[in-house]
């Protein structure tokens, strides 16, 4: 029995001295494995008398239990050390100041839209809105665009399954507003997203427009020129900005014009289209063209943003590059 006590004492001492799980498992194998020292003692019981086998066998089993208890305790201790080390590594210093959330900012196109609306609001225009998916009547027919007009072609317009379209301009907002209001005077600015099959450095399949409309008795082309010239000079903050109105054609206005401004390079730059509302358009919204006249104009807000912020590629606005967009934060 003295030999058994010595072996188990040495085993327990080795267990308590183990520094890691690998060493602990090796000690267990040395004493309780198939060829372990305590296991080997049990194999000698067959050589003993029944009385000795009973007494010594019970003692060996007791020693094995003591060893296993010491082993379990050491394993728990090593687990606790491992846990504490991990917690220490992951500990948060709650005395450190927090990181401030970086504030967002408005998109440059949104800033441009707001500036346009602000300027026209100051001239008595109210903001109107409408759906981005339009039917044929509001997007084409009511605006004096016949069935064979090139603007209806598949290569220019996004059609949906039921024949409706993604609006190609914000003019349908004007139609809906006039039909709803019934009677002039009407003075609105209609900003929003529009869609056309086009994509390059200065065009996008989705872009932003703002269209203005003024319908009232006695409105003339001179009023159109005065209003738009005042707006464009205020927008670019240049009282001496040269503006010209160049004859053009649109099915929904007559007469029609393209609007140009003088660029810093000394060349004319197109910034919009305009004209007197076509009598057929007024008839389509139940307004008497013999009594009322009106003008309409349209500008590309993305184009205005490019000019305002000196950006030469429209696609940069929609690449979601935060480093680029942060330049325009206010």
Curated annotation (Swiss-Prot):
Its cofactor is Mg(2+). Coiled coil: none annotated. Keywords: Aminoacyl-tRNA synthetase, ATP-binding, Cytoplasm, Ligase, Magnesium, Metal-binding, Nucleotide-binding, Protein biosynthesis. Its EC number is 6.1.1.20. It catalyses: tRNA(Phe) + L-phenylalanine + ATP = L-phenylalanyl-tRNA(Phe) + AMP + diphosphate + H(+). PROSITE patterns: AA_TRNA_LIGASE_II. It is found in: Cytoplasm. Binds 2 magnesium ions per tetramer. GO terms for cellular component: cytoplasm. GO terms for biological process: phenylalanyl-tRNA aminoacylation. Mg(2+) binds at residue 254. GO terms for molecular function: ATP binding; magnesium ion binding; phenylalanine-tRNA ligase activity; tRNA binding. PANTHER family: PHENYLALANINE--TRNA LIGASE, MITOCHONDRIAL, PHENYLALANYL-TRNA SYNTHETASE. Belongs to the class-II aminoacyl-tRNA synthetase family. Phe-tRNA synthetase alpha subunit type 1 subfamily. NCBIfam families: pheS (TIGR00468). HAMAP family: Phe_tRNA_synth_alpha1. Tetramer of two alpha and two beta subunits. This is Phenylalanine--tRNA ligase alpha subunit.
């Amino acid at each position: 029995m003295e030999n058994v006590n010595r072996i188990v004492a040495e085993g327990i001492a080795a267990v308590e001295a183990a520094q890691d799980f690998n060493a602990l498992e090796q000690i267990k194998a040395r004493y309780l494995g198939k060829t372990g020292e305590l296991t080997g003692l049990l194999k000698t019981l067959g050589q003993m008398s029944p009385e000795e086998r009973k007494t010594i066998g019970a003692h060996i089993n007791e020693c094995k239990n003591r060893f296993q208890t010491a082993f379990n305790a050491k394993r728990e201790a090593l687990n606790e050390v491992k846990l504490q080390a991990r917690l220490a590594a992951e500990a948060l210093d709650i005395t450190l100041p927090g990181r401030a959330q970086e504030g967002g900012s408005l998109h440059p196109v949104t800033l441009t839209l707001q500036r346009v609306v602000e300027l026209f609001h100051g001239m008595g225009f109210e903001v109107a809105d409408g759906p981005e998916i339009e039917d044929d009547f509001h997007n084409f027919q009511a605006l004096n665009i016949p069935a064979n007009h090139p603007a209806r072609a598949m290569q220019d317009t996004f059609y949906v399954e039921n024949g409706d379209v993604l609006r190609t301009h914000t003019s349908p907002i004007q139609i809906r507003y006039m039909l709803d209001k019934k009677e002039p005077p009407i003075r609105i600015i209609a900003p929003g997203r529009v869609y056309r099959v086009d994509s390059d450095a200065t065009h996008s399949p989705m872009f932003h427009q703002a269209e203005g409309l003024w319908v009232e008795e006695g409105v003339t082309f001179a009023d159109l020129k005065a209003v738009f010239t005042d707006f464009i000079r205020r927008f670019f903050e240049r009282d001496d900005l040269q503006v010209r109105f160049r004859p053009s054609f649109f099915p929904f206005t007559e007469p029609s014009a393209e609007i140009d401004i003088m660029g810093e390079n000394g060349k004319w730059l197109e910034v919009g289209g305009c004209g007197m509302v076509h009598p057929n358009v007024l008839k389509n919204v139940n307004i008497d063209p013999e009594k009322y006249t009106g003008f309409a104009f349209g500008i590309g807000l993305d184009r205005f943003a490019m000019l305002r912020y000196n950006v030469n590629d429209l696609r940069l606005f929609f690449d979601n590059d935060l480093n680029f967009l942060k330049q325009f934060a206010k």
